[in-house]
Amino acid sequence: MVVAVYPGTFDPLTRGHEDLVRRASSIFDTLVVGVADSRNKKPFFTLEERLDIAHEVLGHYPNVQVMSFKGLLKDFVRTNNARVIVRGLRAVSDFEYEFQMAGMNRYLLPDVETMFMTPSDQYQFISGTIVREIAQLGGDVSKFVFPSVEKWLTEKVAAMDPASGASAGQP
């Protein structure tokens, strides 16, 4: 049984992420979607919200598990007995960083492979950062995220404090 881990911040989970999950889940016996805590990135959604979103969007895949992780990816990979790390590459600009990370992961986990997947054509330009920016500026993100994610974005943006730009209830 081959287990793969697809790690990410998923802030928010986009149609591009789901496309990769759909395709990777057809290759591996189990695909573990690891939602990274990523506090240093100051995510728009809390870890709990990102987990809820991922469960809503990906819950219908029978061989996909969604869980959070903190700390080093290598520890999460080992905990889940994974043999493969799945990463998405949208553009050449992604490759340099991902290539360095794959090299480090190979050093830390010599028996684990990194598999790069490119998105389907219609999702090559989608990123969580761009989706968040469009949503915060009142734009239509319905082509980039699932309806449930669009609802999460709309509610989160509405809860923003216009005076400070910070989310309500957060510093």
From Swiss-Prot:
Its EC number is 2.7.7.3. InterPro entries: Cyt_trans-like (IPR004821), PPAT (IPR001980), Rossmann-like_a/b/a_fold (IPR014729). The record marks H17 as: Transition state stabilizer. One of its GO terms (cellular component) is cytoplasm. Substrate binds at T9, K41, L73, R87. Its cofactor is Mg(2+). GO terms for molecular function: ATP binding; pantetheine-phosphate adenylyltransferase activity. Belongs to the bacterial CoaD family. This is Phosphopantetheine adenylyltransferase. It comes from Paraburkholderia phytofirmans (strain DSM 17436 / LMG 22146 / PsJN). The lineage of its organism: Bacteria, Pseudomonadati, Pseudomonadota, Betaproteobacteria, Burkholderiales.
